[in-house]
């Protein structure tokens, strides 16, 4: 990305535009600013200022390195909210997360899942609702699994149960 592009977009725009970050959805500014949603997260006001700044200027030296983690943890909370589930639902229906590599799943759309809610434990995986298996995504993503957490697919499908189609039972 050229420096002129960096200078004309917000940190969130810049971050979401990085190759490999396509699993993430945009967390609205009002959600990020709500102190209730920040509860329990370690952060510095400078990081929040960088994330919410309408224009990013990476040459100013105001990037601290913790923005990715902080945005990721807010993202994990947001995708469990009604608005977040709607945003992830759109991405799921478009197939943004990829499809199950298991042939018997017939290219079932998948969801991102973290194997841990603790930052730095593992990268994101994809979860198939048909075979209930987790796989490494085909996309070139190195997102931390904590940005989604281990319970996201369960929450998603409990709120939208008609989206799953179980594998055909060969005994019937």
UniProtKB/Swiss-Prot annotation:
One of its GO terms (cellular component) is cytoplasm. Probably not expressed in wild-type flies. In males lacking the Y chromosome, it is testis-specific and constitutes the main component of star-shaped crystals. SMART domains: CK_II_beta. Signal peptide: none annotated. Induction: In wild-type flies, it is strongly down-regulated by double-stranded RNA (dsRNA) interference mediated by Su(Ste) transcripts. In males lacking the Y chromosome, the absence of Su(Ste) locus, relieves such down-regulation, explaining why it is strongly expressed. One of its GO terms (molecular function) is protein kinase regulator activity. PANTHER family: CASEIN KINASE II SUBUNIT BETA (PTHR11740:SF0). Interacts in vitro with the casein kinase 2 alpha subunit (CkII-alpha). The relevance of such interaction is however unclear in vivo. Unknown. In males lacking the Y chromosome, its strong overexpression leads to the appearance of proteinaceous star-shaped crystals in the primary spermatocytes causing meiotic drive, possibly by interfering with normal casein kinase 2 activity. Belongs to the casein kinase 2 subunit beta family. There are multiple copies of the stellate gene in fruit fly, encoding proteins that are extremely similar, which makes their individual characterization difficult. Thus, most experiments probably do not discriminate between the different members. This is Stellate protein CG33236/CG33240/CG33244/CG33245. It comes from Drosophila melanogaster.
